[in-house]
Amino acid sequence: MTMEINNTDPFEKMPLPDDSGLSGSGAFDDSKLAKLNGVISQGLNPYPYKFEKDEDICEILEKFEDFEKNEGLTVRTAGRLYNIRKHGKMIFADLGDQAGRVQVLVRKGNLPDEEFEIFKNLVDSGDIIGVQGDLFRTKRGENSISVSEFSLLSKSLCALPEKFHGLKDVETRYRKRYLDLIVNAEKREIFVMRSKLISEIRRFLTDREFLEFETPILQTVYGGANARPFTTFHNCLGQNLFLRIAPELYLKRLVVGGYEKVFEICKNFRNEDIDTTHNPEFTMIEVYEAYRDYNDMMDLTESLVSELVFKLTGSYEVQMGEKTINLRSPWKRISMEDALKEYAGLDIFAHSIEDLKKIAIENRIEDYEKAKSHGEFLALLFEGLVEDKLIDPTFIYDFPVENSPLAKNHREKAGFVERFELFLNGWELANGYSELNDPLEQEKRFEEQDKKRKLGDLEAQTVDYDFINALGYGLPPTGGMGLGIDRLTMILSGLESIKEVILFPQMKRED
């Protein structure tokens, strides 16, 4: 059978934005274009292939710590030029790479006259150059490199923001993150922190003999969380596919297959609202361990997060605005039912459903009309009345079964499941279960979810019969946990917007 391939250009019917001033030569500075032509007319390549960079700037700065020994030492490095200051026969500038900045001095007499004139007239702030020169200190004590050789490595054609005004517009920083990183060193540090965070998560788990796996991003059946998916179409297979909303069901298949400690650091995609703590494309880690339950997963989560915070910041305390949050163990653990009593003064089971509706209306809690049971009202009122009060790290455990289709029934409390969520700064940071491993119960839960979906609940889960079949071969008792890396980076950096910790957050097109 021959499958018809859809070769339609996906952009063919999409209105294209007005790119005037944003792309091509229209975005480039006229004076920089003229200088580019000047460089070429000198027979120089403004974009050479390679430069032997012997030292990072941070290593050069370390040499100044023993200046008596290293004065006059010849160094060779490269970076981007900032803040060029011309003083007749002397030109000062700052040279920066990913690790630091150092002042450079280009002096007539240290370079051939022709090269000095090229630097003076054709090199700009924003250009990337390589330099060789000797370490010295100015009369004002400024650590500097006296340049004896330079190479233009990349001629910039776009002007950097002014020194004193910088790049302040938040939306521009998000849309042009590359420019944000060029001019705002403190923003670069956020993503250095994020990179180290992910490395430390891997180290923590691999030290405990967990294995890292990769599971599909494109899936025929989406699941593992209650969320709306992104849909696409596979031309060759002739079928719809969904972008992953969670890796959970595939990772549990791996535990069925015999791997007892697994994790994945992954991108997930949820077609939902965008706000200060939600982005449709986000990063998380999911961890599963056989022969463990949700108590063990709380222990693992607490150890992981508290160790990460201390390793990356040198302290167990983080600052969120005016709030100081202490992540030193032990953390508070309280059931959802008791948390509602403690923080909102509400005993959920002492009220009728009609009473709970009135309470929801009085507190302007949305979607109360969807709640039909005490369990559903417990989850709804907890979210509306308690979550934002959980500033210090707090595990909320024992959730109602109605909104937890993948968690194991509670061993003692009917109507509840063994599930927890970690809250910090009023945000959900992690979610974990004693994993449901009864295939018949899982099928029943999925079918209940599917009924909700068909009645209009677009976040309800679908039935994954292959996953049910996998459970039929036997999933050992298993504990699982998912942790949001974006929000954890926000906590470590003291930031209140998720867009500040995602390099290229989703933004509405500028049509």
UniProtKB/Swiss-Prot annotation:
InterPro entries assigned to the protein according to its UniProt record, in alphabetical order: Aa-tRNA-synt_II, aa-tRNA-synth_II, aa-tRNA-synth_II/BPL/LPL, Lys-tRNA-ligase_II, Lys-tRNA-ligase_II_N, Lys-tRNA-synth_II_C, NA-bd_OB-fold, NA-bd_OB_tRNA
NCBIfam families: lysS_bact (TIGR00499), PRK00484.1 (NF001756)
Binding site for Mg(2+) 1: 421, 428
Top-level taxonomy: Archaea, Methanobacteriati, Methanobacteriota, Stenosarchaea group, Methanomicrobia
Annotated protein name in UniProt: Lysine--tRNA ligase 2
Localisation: Cytoplasm
Cofactor binding note of this UniProt entry: Binds 3 Mg(2+) ions per subunit.
Region span, Disordered: 1-22
Keywords: Aminoacyl-tRNA synthetase, ATP-binding, Cytoplasm, Ligase, Magnesium, Metal-binding, Nucleotide-binding, Protein biosynthesis
Family per record: Belongs to the class-II aminoacyl-tRNA synthetase family.
